[in-house]
């Protein structure tokens, strides 16, 4: 059953009016305010008289759908499957919560009858000395007694006739005044397909109550059992849904309390900042007064903007809380006050409603905060030719706009301090220009996630933060950089930690001949040689790389790590060159 809401702020007033009705909502129609007459249960679990529902204007023709559409009403357990063909979908608005209700193919009269409400109405009439109750048999005279066996209300004449009949001679008759202490005096619920038969059985295949004639006809060969035998299984499933729904009520109440707290803090902060603005503006006469008024207007705009956001979230959560409460209260009332058959009849629409409520997503945190501050030393331009100071600061860091930079961002050495810089920016990409943000950094080895490395975050007070750490072992590390529990741009990322830097044991030279002083036995890792018995390289000779290089490994970069390994089997003359 799909539901479409009208604007939420308009719903809040209707919701308050509906809640103000109190306990009379169990016996009185919310539309006509009279005792229920043939009450129908809507998918939103609100009950309205059949006649009142029929007077409502159709909301719209929604679409063309088949019987398996999720917008079709499952309110009536007696809906004919053959009617589930393509037909126009008509909707009405619930007069209590403004939810759009897609009517079943049979219209309003195909909605589920709220037998629980009918029982409450009957009890209400009994407590009022039976005024307004007419005989169930003749429908002409006022009720005097009730047959506990037939569950029928009878006038004096029909009561005497009831006793004279052989089949009903020994039925128990009770005066209406003796029924005032009863909590349930409902009438027998008859099968709509076989009005002479009472619904006492439950078809497991069709998931609906049936009578004796149904199980030998339409439901022949379907598994069925007495309602008293299956109520435990189906009642437990409804109770499980109820238990899943109840925590949402508490969560929504806590969320509304937080919104109220934030709203109060916002008001206090606005007043405090306004006081600062007024104090600062006293020394500047007209120019400062004009500047003050501009600041107050800006502050008020911020207040209105944030209050509107809070009120909208508050209205949404209040509406959702009302829906949750309606579902919980109705289900609790059904499970505690309803008969086995009443629970089974109403089970379908209750289960559908509770499932949908449990799937609704909502944020338990306020959508805005009360962070507003006044910066009196900040330049605000000129006002009437005067240089004025003071500005309202609502700038907040946006983790998605923050930037990570540094040579050691993706590489590091074991037992050597590595560092990088975090530049904080707001949503527009502007630098924060100030510190104080809650920056959280974690450096964790990929193969030892339970052993994070100690990190140091230095606040530079200009919107940038220097992060440093010292890895103890080589390997792949994962770095997390978060602000307000949100990853910054590029986080998380991996860092490759190499072994400690290996210095060059050789010399950085132009050639072996020059660095060794002309020794013939001196060699070089570049592999160059010279004629005349020289084993090392020389300018312009075979194998010389043409530029300065390291004699130990042949690398061309002076500030680099030596790649020479003992397994290369370097000749002794190479080491002699190193010594020279």
UniProtKB/Swiss-Prot annotation:
Keywords: Coiled coil, Cytoplasm, Metal-binding, Nucleus, Repeat, Transferase, Ubl conjugation pathway, Zinc, Zinc-finger. It holds the Pfam family Filamin. Zn(2+) 1 binds at residues 135, 138, 158, 162. One of its GO terms (biological process) is bone development. It catalyses: S-ubiquitinyl-[E2 ubiquitin-conjugating enzyme]-L-cysteine + [acceptor protein]-L-lysine = [E2 ubiquitin-conjugating enzyme]-L-cysteine + N(6)-ubiquitinyl-[acceptor protein]-L-lysine. SUPFAM superfamilies: B-box zinc-binding domain, E set domains, RING/U-box. Gene3D superfamilies: Classic Zinc Finger, Immunoglobulins, Zinc/RING finger domain, C3HC4 (zinc finger). It is an enzyme of class 2 (transferase). Its EC number is 2.3.2.27. GO terms for molecular function: ubiquitin protein ligase activity; zinc ion binding. Zn(2+) 2 binds at residues 191, 194, 214, 219. A zinc finger (B box-type) spans 130-176, 186-227. One of its GO terms (cellular component) is cytosol. It comes from the Eukaryota. Disruption phenotype: Deletion mutant mice show earlier onset of death and exhibit higher mortality in response to lethal challenge with LPS. The production of TNF-alpha, IL-6, and IL-1beta is also significantly up-regulated after TLR challenge. It is found in: Cytoplasm; Nucleus. SMART domains: BBC (SM00502), BBOX (SM00336), IG_FLMN (SM00557), RING (SM00184). Belongs to the TRIM/RBCC family. PANTHER family: BONUS, ISOFORM C-RELATED, E3 UBIQUITIN-PROTEIN LIGASE TRIM45. E3 ubiquitin-protein ligase that plays a role in the regulation of inflammatory response. Mechanistically, mediates the 'Lys-48'-linked polyubiquitination of TAB2, a regulatory protein of the kinase TAK1, leading to its degradation via the proteasomal pathway and inhibition of the TLR-mediated inflammatory immune response. May act as a transcriptional repressor in mitogen-activated protein kinase signaling pathway. This is E3 ubiquitin-protein ligase TRIM45. The gene is Trim45.
């Amino acid at each position: 059953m799909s539901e479409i809401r009208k604007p939420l702020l308009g719903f809040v007033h209707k919701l308050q009016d509906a809640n103000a009705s109190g306990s009379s909502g169990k016996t009185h129609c919310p539309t006509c305010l009279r005792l229920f007459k043939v009450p129908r249960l809507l998918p939103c679990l609100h009950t309205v008289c059949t006649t009142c529902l029929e007077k409502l204007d159709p909301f719209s023709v929604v679409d063309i759908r088949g019987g398996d559409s999720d917008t079709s009403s499952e309110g009536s357990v007696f809906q004919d499957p053959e009617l589930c063909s393509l037909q126009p979908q008509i909707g009405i608005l619930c007069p209590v919560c403004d939810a759009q209700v897609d009517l079943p193919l049979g219209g309003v009269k195909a909605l589920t009858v709220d037998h629980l409400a009918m029982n409450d109405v009957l009890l209400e009439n009994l407590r009022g000395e039976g005024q307004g109750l007419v005989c169930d048999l003749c429908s002409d005279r006022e009720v005097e007694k009730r047959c506990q066996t037939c569950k029928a209300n009878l006038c004096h004449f029909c009561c005497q006739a009831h006793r004279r009949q052989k089949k009903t001679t020994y039925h128990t008759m009770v005066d209406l005044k003796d029924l005032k202490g009863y909590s349930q005096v409902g009438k027998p619920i008859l099968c709509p397909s076989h009005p002479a038969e009472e619904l006492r059985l439950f078809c497991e295949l069709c998931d609906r109550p049936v009578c004796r004639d149904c199980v030998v006809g339409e439901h022949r060969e379907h598994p069925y059992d007495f309602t008293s035998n299956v109520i435990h299984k189906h009642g437990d499933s409804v109770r499980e849904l109820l238990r899943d729904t109840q925590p949402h009520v508490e969560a929504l109440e806590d969320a509304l309390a937080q919104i109220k707290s934030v709203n109060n803090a916002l008001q206090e902060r606005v007043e405090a900042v306004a006081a600062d603005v007024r104090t600062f503006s006293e020394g500047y006469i007209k120019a400062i007064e004009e500047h003050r008024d501009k600041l107050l207007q800006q502050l008020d705009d911020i207040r209105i903007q944030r209050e509107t956001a809070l009120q909208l979230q508050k209205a949404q959560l209040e509406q959702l809380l009302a829906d949750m409460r309606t579902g919980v209260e109705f289900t609790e009332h059904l499970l505690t006050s309803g008969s086995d058959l009443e629970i089974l009849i109403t089970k379908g629409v209750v289960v559908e409603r509770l499932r949908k409520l449990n799937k609704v997503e909502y944020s338990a945190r306020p959508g805005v905060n009360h962070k507003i501050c006044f910066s009196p030393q900040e330049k605000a331009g000129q006002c009437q030719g005067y240089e004025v100071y003071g500005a309202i600061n609502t700038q907040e860091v946006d983790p998605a706009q923050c930037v990570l930079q540094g040579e050691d961002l993706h590489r590091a050495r074991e037992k050597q301090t590595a560092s990088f810089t975090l530049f904080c920016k707001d949503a527009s990409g502007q630098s924060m220009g100030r510190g104080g943000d809650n920056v959280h950094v974690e450096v964790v080895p990929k193969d030892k996630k339970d052993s994070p490395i100690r990190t140091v975050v230095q606040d530079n007070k200009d919107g940038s933060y220097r992060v440093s750490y010292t890895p103890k072992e080589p390997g792949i590390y994962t770095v997390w950089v978060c602000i307000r529990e949100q990853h910054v741009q590029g986080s998380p990322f991996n860092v490759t930690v190499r072994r400690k830097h290996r210095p060059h044991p050789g010399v950085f030279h132009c050639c072996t001949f020059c660095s060794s002083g002309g020794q013939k036995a001196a060699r070089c890792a570049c592999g160059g040689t010279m004629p005349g018995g020289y084993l090392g390289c020389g300018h312009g000779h075979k194998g010389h790389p043409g530029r300065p290089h390291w004699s130990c490994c042949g690398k061309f970069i002076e500030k680099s790590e030596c790649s020479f390994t003992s397994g290369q089997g370097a000749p002794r003359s190479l080491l002699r060159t190193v010594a020279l």
